[in-house]
Amino acid sequence: GTGSFGRRFIETVLTRARPRKLIVFSRDELKQHEMQLDLAERFDPETLRCMRFFLGDVRDRERLSLAMRGVDIVIHAAALKQVPAAEYNPSECIHTNIMGAENVVRACLANQVRQVIALSTDKACNPVNLYGATKLASDKTFVAANNLSGDIGTRFAVVRYGNVVGSRGSVAPLFQRLSARGAAELPITDERMTRFWITLNQGVDF
């Protein structure tokens, strides 16, 4: 996709490999346009010949299935991840994070995709909010899909990250903005909390 992970992942693949086809599937046309412009500055036209950009939403199984034709590997990174927004809009979070995961599974099976990796979060472990609960349900959907692949042989896996430093919506950019404005204090939810951090590069390399 066109999020923090998706952009870095695409850049890494283009740098390290020569894929026959590399598809970006996301619902934000502006971010896709900006990503295309950014890639054009970083890579030569020959390297970018493999790139395809599909507008679509994981809620739309038919569009997903169309995008996955002839695809060997799928990385599923789409999610609504802002905790307060999820609590205020529970049905939207459920539709994207749970039903979207089910749509990805079915589209992958229909197209005989070889390998599927779903990105998840440590908040899915003993969840205390709706976001974590939806990601737990999503994780179980992907793991259980291994029982459905049959002779197709599609393998489904889930990787749970901690907080990714600098990703969209993470606390690091907020702290940077506040610090630049001369804030005397940085807000935290609870002084007893513990957060686990990885860099974006660590997430991609994993």
Label for each model-derived stretch:
Residues 26, 54-55, 95:
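Conserved residues in the N-terminal Rossmann fold of short-chain dehydrogenase/reductase
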Residues 1-15:
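N-terminal Rossmann NAD(P)H-binding glycine-rich loop of SDR-like oxidoreductase domains
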